[in-house]
Every structure is written in C-alpha cells, then in structure tokens.
Amino acid sequence: MSQILFKTKTFWYGIALTFCIATLSYFLAKLPFLMILGQLVTAILIGIIIRALFPVPDKWFTGIQFSNKVILRAGIILLGFRLNLVDIYHAGWRVFLIAALCLSFGITIVYFLAKLFGVDKKLAILVACGTGICGAAAVVAISPQVKADNNQTAVAATIIALLGTIFTVIYTLIYPILPLGPDGYGIFAGATLHEIAHVIAAADPGGSSAVDMAVIVKLTRVALLVPVCFVVAKMVNAGTKNRFSWAELPVPWFIFGFLATSAINSFGIIPTSVTDFLVICAYFLIAMSMGGLGLNVHLPSFGKMGGKPFAAALIGSVFLSVFGLALVLLFHLAG
C-alpha cells in the first residue's frame, strides 16, 4: 500500500512541477525581453533549464509524461472552443494540400539524409516520421511498426523534442520579418513544425487567427499518422514473416474532441464568457505540457548518441521550413 501511495505521490510531483512551470512562464512572459517569445515558448525553455541544472527524479517523469501527453490533448480539445468550423471551410483545399505535401517532403528528405549519413534504418525512419508528422508522438507510434528498440525510440524522441524547441524559438524571432500575415504564418508553422505543442507556441505571437490556422494544418498532419503507419508497416514487413496488425495502428482520437468543441462553439451553444474562460484554461494546460516537453530534453544525452541522426533531422528541418514557406507563397496564402 505504501509503495502505491509513494508512486502516486511522485506522479503528482511531476504534474505539480509542470504546473509551477506554466505559472512561472505566465508571469515571466509579461517581461519586455520575453514578451516576444510568449508564455508557451518560455515554458519550454524553463523546462530545459530546470532539467539541465537540477536533478529531476526519474520517478517524477510518470507525471511529467502525463502532462506532456494527456494534458496536452485536453488543452487542444478545449482550444477548439475558440475555433469556428466555418474557418476550416474557408481555409480551402490548398491548406490541406500544403499539409500533405510538407508531411511527405519532411519524411522523405530526413530519411534520405539519415541514410546518406549512415544512420541505422530503424532510427532513420523514426526521426523522419517524427519530423514529418507529429513529433515524439509519431516516433512512439511508428516504433512498434519497425520493431525499434527502446534506445532508438528514446534517441529519436529526444532529437525531435530538441529540434522542435529550437525551431519554435527561431520561428518566433523571425516572424516579424517574414513576408507572411497571421493566417499565412499559421499555415507555415502548422505545416513545418514538429510537435503540436511547438506549433501552438510558435503561432501564438501571430494572434488567434494564426493559432487557429496552425492547429487546423497541424491536425491534418496528425490525422495522416494512421495511413503513414500502415504504409511504413507494410514496407518494413515486406518479404518477412511478420504479420501486419490493424490493432497496432494508433488513432489520434483527440482530433474528434477538438472538432466536437469547435462545433459547439460554431453553433453558439455556450456563452462567449464561458468559452473565453475555457480557452484560457486551454492555454494553461498547453503551457504545462510545454514545461513537460522541456523537461524531456536531456542535453548530455546527445554526446552519447552521436551527431549523425541529429544532423540529418536538423538539415532536413531547414529544408522543410524553406519548402513550406515556398508553398505558402506559391499558393498565394501569405496573407
């Protein structure tokens, strides 16, 4: 009984740590030199700094992972109360095409570079899918399809978490000089950044319309996780005795929750004052997940894993950013 209680306590300690990070980031983001980054990016950076400077107990990571995954999805579902489904219709087919093209390009270029650098095939697939689809969630989903071991999965997830954080900060800083309006910037961020959390954090300086568009585009990429898993599993298992299982395919159910809250908001069922409060709660929950994301970045581990997969993902992410920006401009969606 005491062991169960102890585990329960450490679980809540992890959640409490992300709660404190979210609270601290809320106030720090009001400072002039951090205002440009915003609360969400600040939360990521606080998490990274805490992990680098202080020994975070391993047992706390159960709660931290809960914040990083479950609380993030709860925040995204609540964020739907700010979106009107009419906005999705107005986004048009070009937006969804950009999402699909960037996903395909991201996976292809990173995998090609990883193999060029001599990275193990399984690790190359994990890093490529993490870059092209939805970050660490894609890494974890693809891992059983390619029969990757725990070390390969952890390495790929760490690479994506760190790269996504770096690019989130860069996007936030260069937004004022990009030839993009809020909607165009949201499409660009949603089509090219790694994690859903990264997308929301990077789009936040562009305002509500940028975040809404970014979430729509990013969730389009997330929705494609299932067919990508299917294709990867069939390709990897071709010519082997391994049997494909539909039960192993991951389904991102939280997307339906996001669409449901968006529909409720579109019909005006809930008063604006209530939805405004729910959106504030959504941002706080997402900030908690940002803190968890930062806490998962273990900088010393990069000295052990080698730089090849990181270099492949870094160069591939740069190409993906340029490709995504070019598509937004080509399809005349910069505004």
Swiss-Prot record:
<keyword id="KW-1133">Transmembrane helix</keyword>
<feature type="transmembrane region" description="Helical">
    <location>
        <begin position="309"/>
        <end position="331"/>
    </location>
</feature>
<feature type="transmembrane region" description="Helical">
    <location>
        <begin position="277"/>
        <end position="299"/>
    </location>
</feature>
<comment type="similarity">
    <text>Belongs to the UPF0324 family.</text>
</comment>
<keyword id="KW-0472">Membrane</keyword>
<feature type="transmembrane region" description="Helical">
    <location>
        <begin position="91"/>
        <end position="113"/>
    </location>
</feature>
<feature type="transmembrane region" description="Helical">
    <location>
        <begin position="123"/>
        <end position="142"/>
    </location>
</feature>
<feature type="transmembrane region" description="Helical">
    <location>
        <begin position="10"/>
        <end position="28"/>
    </location>
</feature>
<dbReference type="Pfam" id="PF03601">
    <property type="entry name" value="Cons_hypoth698"/>
</dbReference>
<keyword id="KW-1003">Cell membrane</keyword>
<dbReference type="InterPro" id="IPR038770">
    <property type="entry name" value="Na+/solute_symporter_sf"/>
</dbReference>
<feature type="transmembrane region" description="Helical">
    <location>
        <begin position="251"/>
        <end position="270"/>
    </location>
</feature>
<feature type="transmembrane region" description="Helical">
    <location>
        <begin position="155"/>
        <end position="177"/>
    </location>
</feature>
<keyword id="KW-0812">Transmembrane</keyword>
<dbReference type="GO" id="GO:0005886">
    <property type="term" value="C:plasma membrane"/>
</dbReference>
<feature type="transmembrane region" description="Helical">
    <location>
        <begin position="33"/>
        <end position="55"/>
    </location>
</feature>
<protein>
    <recommendedName>
        <fullName>UPF0324 membrane protein lmo2147</fullName>
    </recommendedName>
</protein>
<dbReference type="InterPro" id="IPR018383">
    <property type="entry name" value="UPF0324_pro"/>
</dbReference>
